[in-house]
Amino acid sequence: TYSVKVPKDYVAWGKGDLLNPAAVLTPATAPRLKESYTSDKIMHIATLDEMMQHKVTVQNDFNVWKFKANDITDVCYGVSKNYVWDASSTIVDPKTNRRASMQAAYNDTAEDFKHYVEWGVHALKYFSTEWPGVPYPFVKMTSFQGYADMEYPMMVNDSHTDNMQFSQMVQDHEMAHTYFPFYMGINETRYAYMDEGWATTFEYLIGQEEVGKEQADKTYKNFRIRKYISDPSAEEDQPIISMSTQVSGAGYGNNSYGKASLSYLALKDLLGDELFKKALHHYMDVWHGKHPIPWDYFNAMSAGAGQNLN
């Protein structure tokens, strides 16, 4: 449980459940947020006009926004007094009909962010039922427009671009980090290839559904692989198993993203989708929250596949 104290008219977007919506949101705004938790439609919780006309938050000098989140490794939040607020939700566990909230907070001039809830709902469904095919483990995901592209448990901080496909790909990538490193508890500083490599792989796989295989292949090759295969420096081509803290520059990027992702896709091709997913689920089930290291991944995938993959 944590609290964010901000002046009136500032909205705080944080990870976890908002515990006191009636204490910080106006009687017109709070019901919209509540409705969004059970609705498939994309709703404007707060428009720019409403934000500018002081119609969104309770008009105390300061408001204290209280949040509660379970099973998280980090806390972050974003605040603004002029961001648009959209929300929807979707079923992420078909067996239990459990839903997750998808929200976005952004500058009204950012055209790509106007699609972020729509794209995010699709990503939540895909990651929950296709790849990795594990129900989204949290109650909410919020995309906040910022000045970097960075993942946090239940939140992503994304920069605005004019390229719609690229913006969707970036959001997909950051949301995929829900599983690696957060769900698994991976040490991303030491083993970046164990989280960035998977996020890159899931970004590519969901991209095939969003823009078609031909375009997804082209983007993957140009954005994730080309720098690696055209790098003339042998010194930068270090083994993927190298600790991420021991490589830098292009070598770090190659190992963490493209090379690692290619290794996962190669194993997927070797085993076939069904057996690969079985092995992946075994790895995730056994090591969820237990901070696996590379050898845990190797052994768990071999055990899950029923083969010696060394």
List PLM regions with ranges.
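Acidic/His/Gly-enriched intrinsically disordered linker/tail segments
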Residues: 196-262, 270-271
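Zinc-dependent metallopeptidase catalytic helix centered on the HExxH motif
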Residues: 157-221, 280
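Acidic/polar loop patches that form or flank catalytic/metal-binding clefts of enzymes
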Residues: 11-15, 133-140, 187-188, 210-219, ...
